Amino acid sequence: MNSTSFSQVENHSIYYNFSEKNSRFLAFENDDCHLPLAMIFTLALAYGAVIILGVSGNLALIIIILKQKEMRNVTNILIVNLSFSDLLVAIMCLPFTFVYTLMDHWVFGEAMCKLNPFVQCVSITVSIFSLVLIAVERHQLIINPRGWRPNNRHAYVGIAVIWVLAVASSLPFLIYQVLTDEPFQNVTLDAFKDKYVCFDKFPSDSHRLSYTTLLLVLQYFGPLCFIFICYFKIYVRLKRRNSMMDKMRDNKYRSSEAKRINIMLLSIVVAFAVCWLPLTIFNTVFDWDHQIIATCNHNLLFLLCHLTAMISTCVNPIFYGFLNKNFQRDLQFFFSFCDFRSRDDDYETIAMSTMHTDVSKTSLKQASPVALKKIHTDDNEKI
């Protein structure tokens, strides 16, 4: 691995494709920019840790859910889809992007040149829209429990639609991504002989900007706004429900339960937004005016933003699985290579799973304090 983040080529400009989500050109002038070996080593350790945690965490989550028949509900089906897409991101995005950013050329062949950005874009789109479907399921469960509720069949149809949309929106990478030695043709240095770069060749800059702007809305701002609205409505409904029970419940118990629910809902939205915000800003700035970013700071800044976004592949299994007691219990069997036990009688209802208990204003007025406590506890388990 080359320790330099940029190649010094006298009187020539070399174009690279660095973005994992939005392909683009970057002209490197006659700058002598180096990343310290200590920095490269630190980044390599960080990327390695994220890859290991992302692959093992999502793989464990998928196996645990698929092994337990009683866990195959709407939310868990969507969680498996989310984990599978995150697994692809951890495998396809992290190692290839990290190596290519630090090297001065592409070494993975023409097929991977096209497949890498295509699979990355597909995986990211699937991950984000899986979060959207989970938000929709929660919204219907809490806001409209007596109305339409998604079942397993709806979940499978939704997943199929997501993958079709993801593949369709990612096709430009498959079409316009090219492997070429064009930037090195006029370079006389031996170090650049038989070297290739992988970048996109859109028909024009306007086509490229239109496409990357569409991805910006499709993969970040649109889903984020929708998810925020869903969780805000859920928060308002739960807060109103808690206020109706103020006089019938122990105040300490009510406060702790409300706090747990609110923290979980807030964490889900914040984790998604915070992880992807740096890379989104970087891509947007670079698309419209790459000269704003100093040449010598480009690689390091991109890797830090990219690494932050990839941390989301580790965060999701924690929020959507490992904070639940069922997964903590099953993980002990998973990592000890023991068989999973069937727990039909004592299996705790997984957080966020669909249940058929709802609370109306009439039932709140008529129910006893003991019954209310039980109903509210069941409702909390649905989140």
UniProtKB/Swiss-Prot annotation:
The encoding gene: NPY1R
Lipid anchor positions (S-palmitoyl cysteine): 338
Protein role: Receptor for neuropeptide Y and peptide YY.
CDD domains, per database record: 7tmA_NPY1R
Main location per the UniProt record: membrane
UniProt cross-references to PANTHER family, sorted A to Z: NEUROPEPTIDE Y RECEPTOR (PTHR24235), NEUROPEPTIDE Y RECEPTOR TYPE 1 (PTHR24235:SF24)
Localisation per UniProt entry: Cell membrane
Recorded GO MF terms: neuropeptide binding; neuropeptide receptor activity; pancreatic polypeptide receptor activity; peptide YY receptor activity
Sites carrying sugar chains: 2, 11, 17, 186
Membrane topology, from the record: Multi-pass membrane protein
Record PTM Phosphoserine, positions in chain: 368
Superkingdom of this protein's organism: Eukaryota
Stored Pfam families: 7tm_1
Name of the protein this chain belongs to: Neuropeptide Y receptor type 1
GO biological process: feeding behavior; glucose metabolic process; locomotory behavior; outflow tract morphogenesis; regulation of blood pressure; regulation of multicellular organism growth; sensory perception of pain
TM region positions: 45-65, 77-97, 117-137, 155-175, 212-232, 261-281, 300-320
Keywords: Cell membrane, Disulfide bond, G-protein coupled receptor, Glycoprotein, Lipoprotein, Membrane, Palmitate, Phosphoprotein, Receptor, Transducer, Transmembrane, Transmembrane helix
GO cellular component: neuron projection; plasma membrane
Annotated S-S bridges: 113-198
Protein family membership: Belongs to the G-protein coupled receptor 1 family.
Keyword Plastid: no
Positions in the Extracellular compartment: 1-44, 98-116, 176-211, 282-299
InterPro entries noted in UniProt: GPCR_Rhodpsn, GPCR_Rhodpsn_7TM, NPY1_rcpt, NPY_rcpt
Cytoplasmic side, ranges: 66-76, 138-154, 233-260, 321-383
